[in-house]
Amino acid sequence: MVDSVYRTRSLGVAAEGLPDQYADGEAARVWQLYIGDTRSRTAEYKAWLLGLLRQHGCQRVLDVACGTGVDSIMLVEEGFSVTSVDASDKMLKYALKERWNRRHEPAFDKWVIEEANWMTLDKDVPQSAEGGFDAVICLGNSFAHLPDCKGDQSEHRLALKNIASMVRAGGLLVIDHRNYDHILSTGCAPPGKNIYYKSDLTKDVTTSVLIVNNKAHMVTLDYTVQVPGAGQDGSPGLSKFRLSYYPHCLASFTELLQAAFGGKCQHSVLGDFKPYKPGQTYIPCYFIHVLKRTD
């Protein structure tokens, strides 16, 4: 493991198998504060996602990287039937707590939350009688958490195949990643606001790129976040944590996605929620892939 020479995550965070980078609990707690609740989601993101799902008549949604549940909560509140899964039990506890606190609301009482692993997703999430979900979402740069341990991206292919298998015929997969093309060419993230959440706690984010055998192997982001009441006297304190990501470039990730559907899909790419054209002047922070199963 590269952890022996390069620390890829905060101390106490798991490094075996599909890594739970929030396993120490502290990173999960700080991340929950960092991204906030549904009110912290940007209006542009909320309008775009809800509009996309309703445009395609989606009702049953699988969130395969729900984390603390912020997107799933938004969808439940908007009337969607939601199944939420994540590999981190430390993150899921926030979603489970919200469901418990709102259990008297029929929509939240029906909200399904499970711990699941992308590598065994076809076993962890039973197929519905309808043959899959209307939409599967994997947003917030979540898929990039999965490393390439074997060096051949076989884990990525298996995970994407399992995720794609959850989509019914005619259904959607909505998945994103940061603009790693820009990060790898410049060494830093594109300038601009975060398109997903309005956090006022960030003090600094440092980007590092790990090169192995002349190939980009990992990107790490070191977050410095101001946490209310974390100081000894109750004043705001600073918390630091590191997360690592596999740097998926646009062209190669597009090939992986289309292979996951066996080529039987319609595929469009957006840059920060707007149609993306290679060579355009505006440099997006995120690439968002929307795939519609056609078989």
From Swiss-Prot:
Result for mutant: residue 50 to P: In GNMT deficiency; 10% wild-type glycine N-methyltransferase activity
Subcellular location: Cytoplasm
Region forming the signal peptide: none
GO biological process, alphabetically ordered: glycogen metabolic process; methionine metabolic process; methylation; one-carbon metabolic process; protein homotetramerization; regulation of gluconeogenesis; S-adenosylhomocysteine metabolic process; S-adenosylmethionine metabolic process
Catalytic activity annotation: glycine + S-adenosyl-L-methionine = sarcosine + S-adenosyl-L-homocysteine + H(+)
Inhibition and activation profile: Inhibited by 5-methyltetrahydrofolate monoglutamate and by 5-methyltetrahydrofolate pentaglutamate, inhibition is much more effective by the pentaglutamate form than by the monoglutamate form. Two molecules of 5-methyltetrahydrofolate are bound per tetramer. The binding sites are localized between subunits. Inhibitor binding may preclude movements of the polypeptide chain that are necessary for enzyme activity.
This protein's record includes keyword S-adenosyl-L-methionine: yes
Residue positions where N-acetylvaline is found in the record: 2
Residues carrying Phosphoserine: 10
UniProt GO cellular component terms: cytosol
An annotated Gene Ontology molecular function: S-adenosyl-L-methionine binding
Keywords from the UniProt entry: Acetylation, Cytoplasm, Disease variant, Folate-binding, Methyltransferase, Phosphoprotein, S-adenosyl-L-methionine, Transferase
Modified residues (N6-succinyllysine): 46, 193, 198, 203
Binding residues annotated for S-adenosyl-L-methionine, in chain numbering: 22, 31, 34, 41, 65, 86-88, 117-118, 139-142, 178, 223
Residues binding (6S)-5-methyl-5,6,7,8-tetrahydrofolate 2, per UniProt: 6, 217, 242
Modified residues (Phosphotyrosine): 34
Subunit structure of this chain's protein: Homotetramer.
Associated disease: Glycine N-methyltransferase deficiency: The only clinical abnormalities in patients with this deficiency are mild hepatomegaly and chronic elevation of serum transaminases.
Protein name per the record: Glycine N-methyltransferase
Gene that encodes it: GNMT
